[in-house]
From Swiss-Prot:
InterPro entries, alphabetized: aa-tRNA-synth_I_CS (IPR001412), aa-tRNA-synth_Ia (IPR002300), Anticodon_Ia_Val (IPR033705), M/V/L/I-tRNA-synth_anticd-bd (IPR013155), Rossmann-like_a/b/a_fold (IPR014729), tRNA-bd_arm (IPR010978), tRNAsynth_Ia_anticodon-bd (IPR009080), Val-tRNA_synth_C_sf (IPR037118)
Coiled coil ranges: 838-870
Organism of derivation: Bartonella quintana (strain Toulouse) (Rochalimaea quintana)
Broad class of the protein's primary localization: cytoplasm
Gene: valS
GO molecular function: aminoacyl-tRNA deacylase activity; ATP binding; valine-tRNA ligase activity
CDD domains tied to this protein: Anticodon_Ia_Val (cd07962), ValRS_core (cd00817)
Keywords: Aminoacyl-tRNA synthetase, ATP-binding, Coiled coil, Cytoplasm, Ligase, Nucleotide-binding, Protein biosynthesis
Family: Belongs to the class-I aminoacyl-tRNA synthetase family. ValS type 1 subfamily.
Motif ('HIGH' region): 45-55
Keyword Transcription regulation attributed: no
Catalytic activity reported: tRNA(Val) + L-valine + ATP = L-valyl-tRNA(Val) + AMP + diphosphate
Localization terms from the record: Cytoplasm
Protein name: Valine--tRNA ligase
Length: 907
């Protein structure tokens, strides 16, 4: 027997253990013989990570599809795993060492420190895997992979060496995002833009050959900068070729204040005549845009920072090249060398002001890139790094999408993909860390590089090159975490070995991802998959939206509006959270997550639980001989027709990745059709002495509930699995767990029965609505008079009159040729249904009540209208407040209309 209350917390834990004990999610479980494979790769979360709402949405969507395809009998593999998360993991362990007062990373040395990280990984790393289990994800956990596992590391080395020998990996000196606290290059995804209240300094740069006079604009050119500390590396000034103010200066030179370096004035479209003075100082070694301008105009690159973002002047040959070492320059070097960049900023501004070079200072709020791990401003930094020639690898990846071999859902994301791929830059793949895949490159005594899969192979290559044994030094850098992630669809299946899994499951079937990693992960999987496997890694990329708070704001720690999915699971259940996310996962629309919605879908789960209890109390049980096509009762034929439509809607919705439409169809059918109407209409049947009708109703209800559990299972797996178990009967043993049951396939259709029962529901609904609007006491039975009833209506009243009386609180049903005075009239089909109000309520009292209500509503509408017609309110109030007021006035107008209709009925 089912408990009175559904205890989600204990049941979800119990069901999770059952799935695991059964091995329900292992690759191929439940697959029909000879069926096609279906494979999804779980985007590997960081081993340091904790479940957030983005994970919850992403994995819920994947799990819906995976459970659906598993129930359809496909050979399913949902491959889970963890990312080693280079920077994040190294930072976590270093912080732990400091907290425990253990030796630092540097004191430990590389080998011991890496061992320490592995210890942390085995002891506490990977918490998120257990958190994902709480959500109910049906991955094959027995195949869990880790990007630092030996098998995946082998694949990484194979790819690196192959690309290097094909000329697609090389070393180069370019600008990178440099974190001066962590002392490593970082990816764009590890950079967050923060708004700061900064300044814009306008400087006068003297023109060569002119005597500088701050009061004479013909002796200088004005440039502006938010970063005075970088001016020491200036090598040019750019002006727009169409800017008449500077055409005569193009090709001439200015002098860098304080330093004396000649700066060529070049014509370049990067300079915007409408911005500031229209002239831009160019620092190619410290700004990404300037780097490109410098390349186009052959300007020198002068790095004036150390790796710690301190000023680097002493022994900086590039800085001194072409300069006369005056006493002033010596003093400048002495004062600024090794100064922190922000201290140097203030010193340089002071020196510029003293020399008359400071023209103006403006307050200038602007965004500054910060390292998301270190929290410090990152620097565009000129350094030697390893790169992948992404441009060449991107071409076939772009073509594959153009040809439709890989499609994006929604299709609009294709444009974003093309924009990124067609403007792709070399991919910096080296990181100055100890944790990660160490680059398989060794250097000889003369710096000659040997790239091989192992040290033994590198030594052999060196011997062949030098003709003798030499000592090699391995490259200290590790690979960007995204490098190993890019191989995920085939490295996890055993590549470069030829395995059965690789042959069966590559290419995979679907990639589900957030839009923020289309470039970082999806595009790179496309490039690597095509290059090494000769085929796209997946035919479909489903891009889900962002989960925002209930007001539509992006979640962030600074705003204090982060919603913890684990807290929601504790409070409402995993199933309720999953269903909420599915309902709100409309394509291309961000999810505004309101906890009250989750509470509502918890009630939805309770509704089905109670419906099952009601069914069992009323003797509902399985009949092995039950066949839908043999059903006789119109009520049962109607529910089977509605169920068939729901099966089609849910199936089509999941197939087309319209999860909200599937969830909506399920909600309407379960809450309204099944619980509110079918079970309600069955009560007289259950209570009757007609054993044949009762038996059919009991068997049909049991069969329909089973199909409902199956349909709802991908969305609410825990509760449906429990109900599947609890509704097993001795004469109907379950063949297996619900997770491995067959997906519903029903094409039952009885339009006549559907028309009859839907008519009955419409009549009851209309009468109930009028009773509520007219304030008719719930206990008072009402007479019903039907005017102009045709043959169909009379036949239906004859068949369903008893049900109508019971459910609509009707005392008598009569037919008439004329409409009664002072009656509520409802037109349904060809007939008019009348409730004579004079016999039911005090007309004058009811009229007074309604007039009072409508007057109050009109006053409220007037108040809100005044607000909304005030431009200052609309412009200055928060958008969500304005939207709330607009919604309120719409609700009031709906209520106003309903009361007006009720008043008309009293005339």
């Amino acid at each position: 027997m089912l408990e009175k209350n559904y205890d989600a917390a204990s049941i979800e834990q119990k069901i999770a253990k059952r799935w695991e004990a059964r091995g329900a999610f292992k690759a191929g479980m439940g697959a029909k013989s000879g069926t096609e494979p279906f494979c999804v790769m779980l985007p590997p979360p960081n081993v340091t990570g904790s479940l957030h709402m983005g994970h919850a949405l992403n994995t819920t969507i994947q799990d819906i599809v995976v459970r659906f395809e598993r129930m359809r009998g496909k050979n399913v593999l949902w491959q889970p795993g963890m990312d080693h998360a280079g920077i994040a993991t190294q930072t976590v362990v270093e912080r732990q060492l400091a907290e425990c007062q253990e030796p630092t990373r540097q004191e430990m040395g590389r080998e011991r420190f890496v061992e320490r990280i592995w210890e942390w990984r085995h002891e506490t790393g990977g918490v998120i895997a257990n958190q994902l289990r709480r959500l109910g994800v049906s991955c094959d956990w027995s195949r869990e992979r880790f990007t630092m596992d030996e098998g995946l590391s082998h694949a990484v080395r194979e790819v690196f060496v192959t690309l290097y020998k094909q000329g697609l990996i090389y070393k180069d000196k370019r600008l990178v995002n440099w974190d001066p606290k962590l002392l490593t290059a970082i990816s764009d995804l590890e950079v967050e833009q923060r708004e700061i209240k900064g300044h814009l300094w306008h400087f006068r740069y003297p023109l060569e050959g002119k005597v500088f006079d701050p009061g004479d604009p013909t002796t200088f050119i004005t440039v502006a900068t938010t970063r005075p500390e970088t001016m020491l590396g200036d090598t040019g000034i750019a002006v727009n070729p169409e800017d008449d103010r500077y055409k005569n200066l193009i090709g001439q030179s200015a002098l860098l204040p304080l330093v004396g370096r000649r700066l060529l004035i070049v014509a370049d479209g990067y300079a915007d005549p409408s911005e500031g003075s229209g002239a831009v100082k160019i620092t190619p070694a410290h700004d990404f845009n300037d780097f490109e301008v410098g390349k186009r105009n052959n300007l020198r690159l002068i790095n004036v920072f150390t790796q710690k973002a301190e000023i680097f002047l002493h022994k900086n040959e590039a800085f001194f090249d072409g300069l006369t070492l005056s006493d002033e320059l010596k003093k400048l070097v002495e004062n600024l060398d090794q100064a922190d960049r922000f201290i140097a900023r203030h010193q340089i501004v002071s020196l510029m002001e003293e020399g008359g070079y400071l023209a103006a200072v403006d307050d200038h709020p602007h965004t500054v890139p910060h390292g998301d791990r270190s929290g410090v401003p990152i620097e565009p930094f000129l350094t030697d790094q390893w790169y992948v020639c992404a441009e060449q690898l991107a071409k076939p990846a772009v073509e594959a999408v153009r040809q439709g071999r890989t499609q994006f859902v929604p299709d609009s994301w294709k444009k974003t993909y093309f924009n990124w791929m067609e403007n792709i830059q070399p991919w910096c793949i080296s990181r100055q860390l100890w944790w990660g895949h160490q680059i398989p490159a060794w250097y000889g005594p003369d710096g000659m590089v040997f790239v091989e899969k192992s040290e033994e192979e590198a030594l052999a290559a060196a011997f062949s090159h030098y003709g003798e044994e030499v000592e090699l030094t391995r490259d200290q850098d590790v690979l960007d975490t995204w490098f190993s992630s890019a191989l995920w669809p085939f490295s996890t299946l055993g590549w470069p070995n030829k395995t059965t899994e690789l042959d069966t499951f590559y290419p995979t079937s679907l990639s589900v991802t957030g839009f923020d990693i289309i470039f970082f992960w999806v595009a790179r999987m496309m490039m690597m998959g095509l290059h090494f496997m000769g085929e796209v890694p997946f035919p479909t990329v489903y891009v889900h939206a962002l989960v925002r708070d209930q007001k539509g704001a992006k979640m962030s720690k600074s705003k204090g509006n982060i919603i913890d999915p684990l807290e929601l699971i504790d409070q409402y259940s995993a199933d309720s959270l999953r269903f909420t996310l599915a309902v709100m996962a409309a394509q291309g629309r961000d999810v505004k997550l309101d906890p009250s919605r989750i509470a509502g879908y918890r009630n939805f789960a309770t509704k089905l639980w109670n419906a099952t209890r009601f069914a069992k109390i009323n003797g509902v049980k399985h009949n092995p001989a039950f066949k839908p096509e043999k059903v006789k009762l119109a009520l049962n034929r109607w529910i089977l027709t509605e169920l068939s439509k729901t099966v089609s809607a849910v199936t089509t919705g999941i197939e087309n990745y319209k999860f909200n439409e599937s969830a909506d169809a399920l909600y309407r059918f379960i809450w309204n059709t099944l619980c509110d109407w079918y079970l309600e209409l069955l009560k007289p049947v259950f209570q009757s002495f007609n054993e044949e009708a009762k038996n059919e109703a009991q068997a049909c209800t049991a069969w329909v509930l089973d199909e409902v559990y199956k349909l709802l299972h991908p969305f609410m797996p825990h509760m449906t699995e429990e109900l599947w178990c609890l509704t097993e009967t001795p004469n109907m043993q379950r063949k297996d767990m619900l997770a491995l049951a067959q997906w519903p396939e029903i094409t039952f259709l009885d339009e006549a029965a559907a028309a009859d029962i839907n008519w009955l529901i419409d009549v009851i609904t209309e009468i109930r609505s009028v009773r509520f609007e007219m304030n008719i006491p719930a206990g008072k039975l009402a007479p019903l008079v039907i005017v102009e009833a045709g043959e169909i209506t009379r036949e239906r009243i004859q068949r369903y009159g008893a049900l109508l009386k019971k459910l609509a609180r009707i005392e008598t049903i009569d037919f008439s040729d004329r409409v009664l005075a002072v009656s509520a009239q409802m037109v349904l089909g060809e007939a008019i249904f009348c409730l004579p109000l004079g016999q039911l309520i005090d007309l004058e009292a009811e009229r007074a009540r309604l007039v009072k209500n409508v007057s109050k509503i009109e006053q409220d509408i007037e108040k809100i209208s005044v607000k909304l017609n005030n431009p200052k309110f609309v412009e200055n109030a928060k958008p969500e407040i304005v939207e709330a007021e607009r919604n309120k006035i719409l609700e009031l107008r709906v209520a106003q209309k309903k009361i007006s209709i009720a008043l008309e009925r009293l005339v």
